[in-house]
């Protein structure tokens, strides 16, 4: 049997919102497999569908830059939020974003070797900034997207670059509408553009979880299947952008809103600073002690 560490319990709590003892029991029952533990909690009705997005860890900025038919979204990390608000750091982020577009680098490693017009490499420029700012800085990731003259980019930054979205709308040049959709994606955080992108494996997995959940609720077997399909449709609506109620007008879906502009959402990239990165341990030991009193 796997050892259930406090760190593992904490991670499960962050992903599900379930209580500490429920999380510990779920991990014990599933031999420490966190994904199975999430399903266990959901089947027992203890936790809602986990988005499986890890706690925000590192600081830094997300930035979106567009040039004609090309656009890039980039995340650059710093150690503290104080530095992320530094004007010099913000300028560095813009420089790097423009360098990605100018060089069409495909990986972070390749980008670091590219040179600016002054002959200085990106790697050298970042080391120079580290020396000036006094913190470790790093280019974490970026994504380039393209469009044609009949399409539009939607660029949106939330909380000064804490969250950034780059959306691609096909068939419409209405940049304001595309930006509104990018804002929706920043707020609601869908996983996919549409249900067509959801794998059969994920759908079948969700269907099985919902079935067990319904049976555990004591629902009669003859209505379970109908109930599961209804809940599955709701689940897909929650994770697919085009099917969601548009944040600026909940009376219509994102798809319907864009249709009034002659457009269609075909792609998006959403970055949130530090997502998926390890967060410092904070007060969890104190919380455990409190539970023992």
From Swiss-Prot:
Matching HAMAP family: EF_Ts
One Gene Ontology molecular-function label: translation elongation factor activity
Gene (name only): tsf
Subcellular localization, as worded in the UniProt entry: Cytoplasm
Function as written in the Swiss-Prot or TrEMBL entry: Associates with the EF-Tu.GDP complex and induces the exchange of GDP to GTP. It remains bound to the aminoacyl-tRNA.EF-Tu.GTP complex up to the GTP hydrolysis stage on the ribosome.
Family: Belongs to the EF-Ts family.
Gene Ontology cellular component list: cytoplasm
Coiled-coil intervals: none
PROSITE patterns (UniProt xref): EF_TS_1 (PS01126), EF_TS_2 (PS01127)
Organism: Staphylococcus aureus (strain bovine RF122 / ET3-1)
Name of the featured protein: Elongation factor Ts
UniProt xrefs under CDD domains: UBA_EF-Ts
Domain of life, source organism: Bacteria
This protein's UniProt keywords: Cytoplasm, Elongation factor, Protein biosynthesis
Region Involved in Mg(2+) ion dislocation from EF-Tu, annotated ranges: 80-83
Keyword Cytoplasm tagged: yes
